Each structure stands twice: as C-alpha cells, then as structure tokens.
Curated annotation (Swiss-Prot):
NCBIfam families in alphabetical order: ade
Family: Belongs to the metallo-dependent hydrolases superfamily. Adenine deaminase family.
The protein's name: Adenine deaminase 1
UniProt organism field: Carboxydothermus hydrogenoformans (strain ATCC BAA-161 / DSM 6008 / Z-2901)
Catalysed reactions, as listed in the record: adenine + H2O + H(+) = hypoxanthine + NH4(+)
Gene: ade1
Statement: the UniProt record of this protein carries the keyword NAD: no
EC number in record: 3.5.4.2
GO molecular function annotation: adenine deaminase activity
GO biological process: adenine catabolic process
HAMAP family found in the cross-reference section: Adenine_deamin (MF_01518)
InterPro entries xref list: Adenine_deam, Adenine_deam_C, Amidohydro-rel, Metal-dep_hydrolase_composite, Metal_Hydrolase
Cofactor(s) the protein requires to work: Mn(2+)
Family annotation (Gene3D superfamilies): Metal-dependent hydrolases, Urease, subunit C, domain 1
Length: 603
C-alpha cells in the first residue's frame, strides 16, 4: 500500500468513527439549507455535515452537532451547491498567475480549475509548464493541468519558442497535478493535416495512446468537423474526448451523438454557449455531456462579472433549469475528468461547497474549500500569498527592434487588392475579404474609410526573425496602433494600426519591456503593461491591480484610438490562431486555415 492509499484509508476510518461514535462530532454543519442534489437533479431541505475537509452526510445532522461544532444556520433561505468547476481555461489569457486568478474566481464559487498551459508551453516548453505546475501546489483551490501534445499547433505555418512532441510526454504528463493532454489542436484541421503533414497525426497518436495508458484524459479540438473528419479526430484523441470549439447547434448535436463531451464556451470574447445549448432546448438531447467552460477571460471581466456563477446564470437565461445548469459545472465535468472526490455533495467527498442566495442570478454568499470558509460576500477571507515566478521563465523576448519599413506591405501601381482578415466579434473564427486600398511609394496603405488596417506578427524568440504581414477589418481604429506579445498560440508579437510608424513603435515598446501590451498614437506611447513571465503573465500586479490596468488600456484604445470592439487585446490575440478558420496571420504570413497554406497579402 503506497503512502497516499494508506492516508485515504486512515481518513475514511476517521469519518466512519465520527458518524458511528456518538462522542465524536462534525467540525462544521450547514444547517437548514436547500441542498442542490446534482445526482438526482432536485432541491430539498437538508443539513450538510463536514468533518475537516470531507462531507460526512447530507440530511438531518442534529446528532453530529457538539459544543465545538461550527453551525451556520441557513434558515431555509439559502441554496447549498457543490463547488463549481471551470473545465477549460488558460491562465495566460487573463495575464494573471494562478494565485491571482484564484483570488478573483474563488469568491464567485469556482473551487476547481482545469487549465491548459499550452500558451506558456508554446513560449517556453517544459520549463514553463513545470513552473506553472509548481504554482498549482500553493493555492487553496484545486487546480489541474492538461498539457499540450504539440507546439506549435501548425508546424511550418508558425514559429513557437519550443517545439513540443511525443518525446516530451513522459516528462510533462507526470508534473504535479497534470491529469491529461489538452486540446488536440494539431489535428483540428483534419483533412489538410492528413494530406500535408501526416507525420503530425502519427506523433499525436503516440502521445494520446501513452497518456491513456497511464490513466490520463485527452481533450479534443474539432472546430467545424463532421462525419469522417470528426470520427478521425475522436479516434486520434483516444475515442473519449471533449471539444470546446463547438460553435453551432448542428456541431454540438453530432459531437454528442459521437459520444464526445461538449464544453460550451462562454468567455470574454468567445461566446458559443447559446448555440450549443439549443441541442437541449430545441432537440431535446440529454445534457449529461454538456459542460460550461470559459476558455479565456480577462481580469477586468472576472472582477466585474464573476466567473463560473456568471456562466451558470447565462445558461439559465437560455431556458435551462437551474439545477441542470449547475450540473454542467459540477457533476458533468467531474465525471469527464474522473475527479471522483468533487462535483457532488455526498458522504466522503471533499467539502467544496457554495452557498447561494439567488438561484437565477447565481449570487454567491459563501464559498468553502475542503470544509474551510475561503470567501464571503464576494471577497476572499483567507490570504493567498503573492506568487513570484523564477527568472528562468522570464526574458522570453529575444528579437531585435523593428523598423516601420520592416512591417510594410509592398505593392505596385496606385491601388492594390489586398486579402483582408475579417474580425468577428466574440468569436475566434474569422471571415475572408478582399479590398482595394491605395498604394504610395510602393507600399499598400491603410484605408480608414473601409476600416482596412495593416496587421503584422513579429517572431519574438530569436529563432528566425520572420515577420508576417496582412490586412484586417473590424477594429475601427481612427489613429495609432497597439501591440502585444500574446497571440494564440505561438505567442509572437502581434500588432495592428493606422500607420506603420506607430505599429513599429508599439512592437518595439513590447520588445523593450520583455513582453507585454503597448498602446501608441502619433509617435507616443499612451499606455503599456509589462508581462515578464513568458511574455504572457504578470507576477508584479495582483488581480485587482491588473483589472484596473487592463480597463485603462481598454479605455485608451477606445477613446484615443477609436477602437470599436470590446476586449481588443484578446480579439487581436486570436487573429493568429491557425487552428480556427478562415484566415489568420502568423510570423510566416497570411494563413488560409482551410487549405493549410500561406497566401500573399496582395492579390
């Protein structure tokens, strides 16, 4: 018997003793609550008795109350739910450390996070993933990781800081709190990956087969896949997988029929839940394999809106029963991930408990993790120490400053037809357009009247110095530029602007900071944010400080630059995501995702 098994046996014996020996009592009783039973999908009056970290029983707990028992009388007015689980998210998208993300998310009822660190994996490889895994051990909530099997997502179409393959799996799958492989993006574009880079499929299957052999899960990533392509993706993932890139009811229905779990994404800029939930509200499908997830949330939204309570409330507003909606962030994800100790209120489970006053709006009053009160009335009541990352995961920006000329898109004549990425608000899918823009001095110029602006990606790891150039429509800028070292998923420096000069200044400010965000106008830096950890995360600001900083940068892009989309940095970052159709941009150029090809920006 190993040490963990021995410890579990001792704990279970102690719980049995407390229940059977009238001299022993609970440490905590939530009395007269309205218990949300996610197993039977019902609500009924009951007490919840807790001993140390574990639930003793759900029912009449009068006999378990002693002089030392903490009794919280909920007066028959408050609902008692299992703690919420975010099943797919990236700390890097929030620009926060795990500790600071937890500080913002725990008060809204989120007690478990399953994060995919493929952003820092792209930037730094195993070194970055291990550093993040180490932080999971010091926070009060439960944080698990699902690691990338491949970086970059599309070898040959983009440059990452480190190339992860199956050779890395025996190491990174055994880091602390790693429970599987994250989204299988390398086989998202199944048809063209099979046609042009079949070796990727071989390597991915080697990784997923190994992962399954040691009891790990594998997340899928199958945007717009149907039929044979979807079946091939599912088999490559190991026959049991999820997908968080489902954007239509039809996709959701087919994936559920294939036995997949569908993570209904509802984040800061990508909102697909309302489409996915139609599989239940219109088609009457069983919801046991539907799961709520955020994928990407900015600190400002976390501080303002909440976290998984906000997701649940939005699901309810689509016509789903509140208990069924809560199942989608408790028992459903716990079942998928094999997290048998959380997700339900039942004897022997961890006492991760949320007390709710308003079931429709998901107003959270108290949060317990492991039987300990950690948050009340929207505020943490326990301290989460600030976490500082080691120097080895900093200084990831190794490129040289750029000139305006290096970002220019060359063209001939007085006008040019340019291929233009069409931004779609609140989606990471894009459209593909062609516009005619003026040419001056052999350079294709921005056309603000058509909202057609130059966009570029600068390789930042010092591996090849490449720069990709194209045009984009949808930001509405009237002046200036903004750049960042966050650009999914290879995370090179991406920039958009109304002049090449301001674009170069923004890029160079990001380089100077060693990673971050910069907003400029008329040759002047208006605001910036340093992201020293992998060029993705700050360990210098707490969650509330970062929230205020991001809000100010958002204000600058709107007021000073004229940007018309909310969360502009997140929207910009996804224009480099080569696994999501139609056109994207990387350091290698303009990418036609559907044909797996680099295409010239000027027709």
């Amino acid at each position: 018997m190993d040490a963990q098994t021995f410890k579990t046996a001792i704990v279970r014996r102690r719980l049995v003793d407390v229940l059977m020996n009238p001299e022993l009592k609970a440490t905590l009783v939530l009395k007269n609550g309205l218990v949300i039973n996610v197993v039977t999908r019902e609500i009924y009056p009951a007490d919840v008795a807790v001993y140390d970290e574990y639930i003793l029983k759900v029912g009449d707990a009068s006999d378990l109350i002693g002089p030392e028992t903490e009794v919280v009388d909920l007066q028959g007015k408050y609902y008692v739910s299992p703690g919420f689980i975010d099943s797919h998210m990236h700390f890097e998208s929030s620009m926060l450390t795990i500790s600071e993300f937890s500080r913002l998310s725990i008060p809204s009822g989120t007690t478990t996070l399953v994060a995919d660190p493929h952003e820092i994996g792209n930037a730094l490889g195993p070194v970055g993933i291990k550093a993040m895994a180490e932080e999971t051990k010091v926070v009060p909530n439960r944080v698990y990781l699902v690691v990338p099997a491949l970086t970059p997502d599309c070898p040959g179409l983009e440059t990452a800081g480190y190339d992860i393959t199956s050779r890395d799996m025996p190491e990174i799958l055994n880091y602390p709190n790693v429970i599987g492989i994250g989204e299988l993006q390398g086989f998202s574009n199944a048809k063209y990956v099979y046609k042009y880079t079949p070796e990727i499929i071989t390597d991915l299957i080697a990784s997923t087969t190994y992962a399954k052999s040691i009891g790990k899960i594998v997340d899928g990533n199958a945007p717009e896949l149907f039929g044979s392509e979807l079946a091939a993706h599912l088999i490559a993932a190991g026959t049991e997988a999820s997908c968080h890139e489902t954007t239509t009811k039809e996709e959701c229905v087919e994936k559920l029929r294939y036995g997949m779990y569908v993570f209904m994404r509802e984040g800061s800029t990508q909102k697909n839940m309302a489409e996915c939930i139609r599989a239940v509200t219109e088609e009457g499908l069983d919801s046991r394999r539907l799961i709520g997830a955020t994928d990407d949330m900015v600190a400002e939204d976390l501080a303002k809106n909440g976290h998984m309570n906000w997701v649940v409330a939005r699901i309810i507003k689509q016509g789903i029963d509140p208990v069924e909606a809560i199942q989608m962030v408790t028992i459903n994800p716990a079942t998928y991930f094999g997290l048998k100790h959380v997700g339900v209120l039942a004897p022997g489970k961890m006492a991760d408990i949320v007390v709710i006053s308003d079931l429709m709006d998901m107003k959270v009053e108290k949060v317990y993790i492991g039987g300990k009160l950690v948050a009340e009335k929207g505020k943490m009541v326990v301290n989460i120490p600030k976490y500082t990352y080691p120097e080895e995961v900093k200084h990831s920006v190794k490129c040289k400053p750029v000139t305006a000329e290096a970002l220019e898109i060359k063209a001939t004549g007085s006008n040019a037809v340019v291929r233009t990425i069409g931004l779609i608000p609140d989606q990471n899918l894009t459209e593909s357009f062609e516009f005619t823009v003026p040419v001056s001095g052999g350079v294709a110029q921005p056309d603000l009247t058509q909202d057609v602006l130059p966009i570029a990606v600068v390789e930042r790891y010092g591996r090849n110095g490449s720069i990709g150039r194209a045009f984009v429509r949808g930001f509405g800028l009237k002046g200036g530029a903004f750049a960042e070292s966050v650009s999914h998923d290879a995370h090179n420096i991406i920039v958009v602007g109304t002049s090449y000069q301001d674009m170069a200044l923004a890029v160079n400010r990001v380089i100077e900071m060693g990673g971050g965000v910069a907003v400029v106008k008329n040759g002047r830096v208006l605001g910036d944010l340093r992201l020293p950890v992998g060029g993705l995360i700050t360990d210098e600001l707490d969650g509330y400080e970062l929230s205020r900083k991001i809000a100010e940068l958002h204000r600058l892009t709107a007021v000073e630059l004229g940007c018309t989309v909310h969360a502009p940095f997140m929207h910009l970052s996804f224009l480099a995501l080569t696994t999501s159709p139609k056109w994207k941009i990387t350091d290698q150029g303009l990418i036609d995702v559907n044909s797996f090809a680099i295409i010239p920006p000027v027709k």
